[in-house]
Amino acid sequence: MTPIEVNNKLPTLTKSKYLTQLQAEDNVKNNKCKYLVKNRNYVAPMELSTKDDLKYGAKGIDEWVKLDGGNDYVLKNYKWVTVDYNGGTQLHIDFDTMLCE
């Protein structure tokens, strides 16, 4: 998947609200949001397709946002890491959790 595809698809798969880094910084500056945990990392379970990887990645993001007591997240980085000799990959996601009005 391309970066645009990931950025367009991931927010549709999460229950938590997706914020761009710029939106997050503006909301913090205007006291509308606060960071709960920065630089959280989640490794999605191995699946058969990138779409399924993204679906389980979204589920992991939502679980961390809920556990942290938030309602929003900021996608910082993601990558598919090759984990076996057959070319199997796992999705690694870096994100911040936030609490917003």
Q: What does each model-identified segment do?
A:
Residues T2, T12-T14, T20, T50, ...:
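Residue-identity detector for threonine
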Residues T2-V43:
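Compositionally biased P/S/T/G-rich terminal and signal peptide-adjacent segments
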Residues I4, A24-E25, D52, L67, ...:
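Intrinsic disorder/low-complexity signal
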Residues E5, Q21-E25, E47, K59, ...:
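Glutamate identity and glutamate-enriched acidic tracts
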Residues K29-V81:
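Short, well-ordered alpha-helical segments
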Residues L75-E101:
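Surface-exposed short loop/turn segments
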